Regions:
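A glycine- and small-aliphatic-rich helix-loop capping segment at beta-alpha/alpha-beta transitions
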Residues: 11-15, 39-46, 228-236
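A structural-propensity feature for long, helix-poor, extended segments
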Residues: 21-56, 243-265
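N-terminal phosphate-binding or glycine-rich loops at protein starts, especially the Walker A/P-loop
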Residues: 2-25
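C-terminal regulatory domains involved in ligand/effector binding and gene-expression control
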Residues: 46-184, 192
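Catalytic-loop motifs flanking and including active-site residues across diverse enzymes
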Residues: 4-8, 39, 219-223
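Accessory "access/gating" subregions that flank catalytic or transport cores
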Residues: 140, 150-264
């Protein structure tokens, strides 16, 4: 609800450098949850310094996808360009009517059964399959991903106040992290800390902070919370964490390829 619209707006703005204004019409899920997801805020920021009128269309008109938006470029009050865009999740967009770009053939296998059989035949683990397909540079990338995840947890645990979005929801991560009870069981403590980490990242997302789409902004708190807890309390090394991220990426890629990572869809 933010990365996709931002990408679409930036692309459309670059294509219409002479336009003196824009209209962004949001439909479906984008319209109904736009302010809470800061969709309107990111569109205004992206189109700046030129003005943009944000329209929320709550009608039940047929749509090609629940996350549909229309962009109009104006010059002297007249329409000079128009585009309908679909935000399919994880920052990916599809322009209505265009043939989707064919992604690079990084992973030749598209089902887990195929990957499992391949790994068994070649006696490799999932992270080794990723390394084979992506190359050694994947570890530098995943290192940055892990650093960003930990930073998001740290910021979230150190911040109080009201979240953006207009619903006056208070941040809970810091309170939950410090709310230790004298008679707290080991299981309760574990649940409290994991939840606090997850809240911390999700609240950073709700405030427009820097997080990792895993695989989307809405799901951004789960992996950081579990992985950080396992590292801090169970002694998992950075290398093991990065390998876990690589394996998780395989699963996420299979879902994105064969189904959808869009909650609205």
């Amino acid at each position: 609800h933010t990365m996709g619209p931002e990408r679409a707006a930036s692309r459309f703005k670059e294509r219409n450098l002479r336009a003196d204004g824009f209209i962004a019409t949001l439909y479906g899920s984008l319209a109904k949850t736009g302010p809470g997801h800061l969709t309107d805020a990111i569109l205004e920021k992206t189109f700046a310094p030129r003005p943009v009128e944000i329209r929320f269309d709550f009608s039940d008109r047929p749509l090609p996808h629940p996350n549909t938006m229309e962009l109009t470029a104006l010059q002297d009050g007249k329409t000079v360009d128009f585009e309908r865009v679909i935000s399919v999740g994880g920052g990916k967009i599809v322009v209505d009517g265009d043939t989707p770009d064919t992604p690079a053939d990084v992973y030749p296998l598209s089902t887990f059964a195929e990957i499992k059989a391949y790994c068994a035949e070649h006696r490799m683990r999932l992270w080794q399959y990723v390394e084979q397909c992506e190359g050694d540079s994947i570890w530098l990338y995943l290192g940055e991903v892990w650093k960003c995840m930990k930073n998001a947890v740290a910021r979230g645990l150190d911040t109080e106040g009201t979240l953006k979005g207009g619903l006056d929801v208070q941040r809970k991560a810091k309170m939950l992290y410090r709310q230790k009870h004298i008679d707290e069981s080991a299981e309760t403590r574990e649940n409290r800390l994991v939840c606090a980490y997850a809240y911390a990242v999700s609240e950073e997302n709700a405030s427009g902070g820097v997080i990792v789409t895993a695989p989307t902004c809405g799901a951004c708190g789960v992996l950081p919370s579990v992985l950080l807890y396992m590292q801090e309390r169970r002694g998992f090394s950075d290398t093991e964490i990065l390998r876990a991220l690589a394996a998780g990426g395989v699963i996420g890629n299979l879902i994105k390829t064969n189904a959808s990572i869009s909650g609205a869809e």
